[in-house]
């Protein structure tokens, strides 16, 4: 009889322990499921926030300050985008067109500019990036500090210091670095047009953006010409600029509304 009672007591004890483990396992499973749901929801919330986009339409320039204090100028026909968590989760922007950056220094969060063809990284510097989709080249000009960059399709790194320029040939994928007075190519911030030997094709694309017109070079023999000069965009109309350039005798032009023909 005592042995029978002992077995009953042991069976009850085992059933009590088994129920406790089942209860603990259920609580643990509920916790895991809740945590997984929370993380999934957290990711969903982050993903649901659209990036902030700012644009400089054709014929205009735009000045802005990013949440971390970085100053940005966008040239005509350019766009920049960054996440809602910029300055907290990281400092990365996407850009198309041309932008000038005065980056707020923060060694713990490097600043990154990603374009269609380039990836530029730095901590706190002043630099200019130009990468329009229709251009044959993408260019980075460093005014102050240091940056490291690479072709978006290559892991090869290039380091720039003060007054250096990196030029990516989009057709070959080759990047060349040389010395350059960076201020010459950032005068657009103050409304200047600086021509440094660009071809008539590149100049036409540039004028299309800043004057919001359509330019056609009808005489293909003119494509070989390159031009130098300085103009004040806010004070000189497109007609005045083309008049000055045409006095070289290398081309003539006509304007009908927003359409310009160079011949």
Provide a role label for each language-model segment:
Residues 1-13:
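Disordered, charged N-terminal biogenesis/targeting segments of membrane/secreted proteins
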Residues 10-24, 31-263:
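A residue-level detector for the "anchor" residue at the start of short, highly conserved motifs
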């Amino acid at each position: 009889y005592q042995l029978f009672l002992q077995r009953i007591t042991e069976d009850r004890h085992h059933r009590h322990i088994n129920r406790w483990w089942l209860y603990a396992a259920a609580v643990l499973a509920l916790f895991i499921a809740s945590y997984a749901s929370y993380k999934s929801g957290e990711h969903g919330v982050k993903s649901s926030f659209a990036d902030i986009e700012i644009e400089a339409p054709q014929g205009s320039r735009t000045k802005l300050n990013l949440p971390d204090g970085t100053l940005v100028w966008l040239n005509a026909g350019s766009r920049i985008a960054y996440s809602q968590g910029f300055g907290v989760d990281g400092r990365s922007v996407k850009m198309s067109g041309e932008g000038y950056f005065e980056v707020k220094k923060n060694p713990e969060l490097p600043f990154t500019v990603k374009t269609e063809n380039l990836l530029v990284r730095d901590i706190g510097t002043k630099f200019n990036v130009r990468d329009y989709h229709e251009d044959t080249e993408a260019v980075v000009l460093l005014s102050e500090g240091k940056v490291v960059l690479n072709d978006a399709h290559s892991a090869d790194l290039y380091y720039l210091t003060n007054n250096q320029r990196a030029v990516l040939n989009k057709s070959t994928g080759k990047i060349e670095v040389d010395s350059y007075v960076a201020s010459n190519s950032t005068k657009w911030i103050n409304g200047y047009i600086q021509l440094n030997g660009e071809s008539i094709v590149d100049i036409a694309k540039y004028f299309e953006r800043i004057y919001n017109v359509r330019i056609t070079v009808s005489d293909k023999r003119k494509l070989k010409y390159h031009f130098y000069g300085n103009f004040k965009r806010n004070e000189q109309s497109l007609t005045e600029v083309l008049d000055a350039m045409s006095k070289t005798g290398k081309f003539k032009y006509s304007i009908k509304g927003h359409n310009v023909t160079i011949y």
